[in-house]
């Protein structure tokens, strides 16, 4: 399945959840979801009663799209969480998603959304413990230091991300310690389930993949 390249805010409208895919626009009244809170298409305004399977599928699609993963990537991550003995499957799944380097770069405020964070990582603008890492799926460990390369600190995407934090549109999560003035942050600890932005019932995803 190819990566989605269409209008990003249509994805939020389709899922009925703000997936924060458009940077600053997603946090304001200009958000397409706030202006048109119904699914795209000719019959979008008509409320549809979803089956249990459809609700489970929608939950999976929403979380997958929020983190920008393809089906195989998401399924592999879920199966790893399911095998883990370090906690409940849902919590471990979210922790694995939040430990992706592109997600950490976004959460630290160095990008306005996860899609842009993925591009920033891929283009070699990010250092992990002083070394360049250009793999968005790289798994960050507790204690890792994430930094924007000195030569990359004035690129527009990084500035846009930091503006969202500085203008109060976004907050940096408690499990991260970020020195905005130094374009650097530390992944201090694993996040707890009640600290993460979980837009869907994780039990829906667990039940879907258990079939």
From Swiss-Prot:
<dbReference type="GO" id="GO:0042274">
    <property type="term" value="P:ribosomal small subunit biogenesis"/>
</dbReference>
<dbReference type="InterPro" id="IPR002942">
    <property type="entry name" value="S4_RNA-bd"/>
</dbReference>
<dbReference type="InterPro" id="IPR001912">
    <property type="entry name" value="Ribosomal_uS4_N"/>
</dbReference>
<dbReference type="InterPro" id="IPR022801">
    <property type="entry name" value="Ribosomal_uS4"/>
</dbReference>
<protein>
    <recommendedName>
        <fullName>Small ribosomal subunit protein uS4</fullName>
    </recommendedName>
</protein>
<keyword id="KW-0694">RNA-binding</keyword>
<dbReference type="GO" id="GO:0003735">
    <property type="term" value="F:structural constituent of ribosome"/>
</dbReference>
<dbReference type="GO" id="GO:0019843">
    <property type="term" value="F:rRNA binding"/>
</dbReference>
<feature type="domain" description="S4 RNA-binding">
    <location>
        <begin position="99"/>
        <end position="160"/>
    </location>
</feature>
<dbReference type="InterPro" id="IPR005709">
    <property type="entry name" value="Ribosomal_uS4_bac-type"/>
</dbReference>
<dbReference type="GO" id="GO:0006412">
    <property type="term" value="P:translation"/>
</dbReference>
<comment type="subunit">
    <text>Part of the 30S ribosomal subunit. Contacts protein S5. The interaction surface between S4 and S5 is involved in control of translational fidelity.</text>
</comment>
<dbReference type="InterPro" id="IPR036986">
    <property type="entry name" value="S4_RNA-bd_sf"/>
</dbReference>
<dbReference type="Pfam" id="PF00163">
    <property type="entry name" value="Ribosomal_S4"/>
</dbReference>
<comment type="function">
    <text>With S5 and S12 plays an important role in translational accuracy.</text>
</comment>
<dbReference type="GO" id="GO:0015935">
    <property type="term" value="C:small ribosomal subunit"/>
</dbReference>
<keyword id="KW-0689">Ribosomal protein</keyword>
<dbReference type="Pfam" id="PF01479">
    <property type="entry name" value="S4"/>
</dbReference>
<comment type="function">
    <text>One of the primary rRNA binding proteins, it binds directly to 16S rRNA where it nucleates assembly of the body of the 30S subunit.</text>
</comment>
<keyword id="KW-0699">rRNA-binding</keyword>
<keyword id="KW-0687">Ribonucleoprotein</keyword>
<comment type="similarity">
    <text>Belongs to the universal ribosomal protein uS4 family.</text>
</comment>
């Amino acid at each position: 399945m190819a990566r989605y390249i269409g209008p990003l805010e249509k994805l939020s409208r389709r899922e009925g959840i703000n997936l924060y895919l458009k940077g600053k626009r997603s946090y304001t009244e200009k958000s397409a979801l706030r202006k048109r809170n119904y699914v795209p298409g000719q019959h979008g305004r008509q409320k549809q009663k979803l089956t249990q399977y459809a609700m489970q599928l929608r939950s999976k699609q929403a979380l997958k799209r929020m983190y920008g993963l393809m089906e195989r990537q998401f399924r592999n991550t879920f199966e790893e969480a399911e095998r883990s003995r370090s906690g409940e499957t849902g919590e471990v799944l979210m922790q694995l998603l939040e430990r992706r380097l592109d997600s950490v770069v976004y959460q630290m405020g160095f990008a306005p959304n996860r899609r842009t964070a993925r591009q920033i990582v891929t283009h070699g603008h990010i250092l992990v413990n002083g070394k360049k890492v250009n793999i968005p799926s790289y798994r960050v460990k507790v204690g890792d230091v994430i930094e924007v390369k000195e030569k990359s600190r004035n690129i527009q995407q990084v500035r846009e991300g930091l503006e969202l934090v500085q203008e109060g549109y976004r907050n940096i999560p408690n499990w991260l310690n970020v020195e905005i003035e130094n374009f650097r942050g530390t992944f201090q600890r694993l996040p707890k389930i009640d600290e993460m932005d979980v837009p869907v019932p994780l039990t829906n995803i667990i039940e879907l993949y258990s079939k």
